[in-house]
């Protein structure tokens, strides 16, 4: 009986809503998916969403519309914790780069800086084979 009460107390604990006025939005746009994670300036994740989490699967995950829906979902949950102003860090060359930024602005977040942090190899790994259609 004591174990059940201890477990009940653990499950009652919830995340406390913090009032975070500014943060950083990391958008990773690959050819297969788009992942949007919103952090505070220290790097602790406030909310995140991806095209797969929002409900798209297969080739629809790589669309620009799926990235828009994912960015709006992440922005909505972050704004509940008091987020107003964000910096945007873009990574990757997928279809959802610009549409994710537009969705953040339309959700009501103020975008102060947009940075492109796409990793560019200085002749590192061998690229995948070319498609022959």
Curated annotation (Swiss-Prot):
Gene3D superfamilies: Ribosomal protein S11
Keyword Ribosomal protein attributed: yes
Annotated GO MF terms: rRNA binding; structural constituent of ribosome
Keywords on record: Ribonucleoprotein, Ribosomal protein, RNA-binding, rRNA-binding
Any Pfam family the entry gives: Ribosomal_S11
Summary of the function given for this chain in its UniProt record: Located on the platform of the 30S subunit, it bridges several disparate RNA helices of the 16S rRNA. Forms part of the Shine-Dalgarno cleft in the 70S ribosome.
Family: Belongs to the universal ribosomal protein uS11 family.
UniProt subunit comment: Part of the 30S ribosomal subunit. Interacts with proteins S7 and S18. Binds to IF-3.
Protein known as: Small ribosomal subunit protein uS11
Lineage: Bacteria, Pseudomonadati, Chlamydiota, Chlamydiia, Chlamydiales
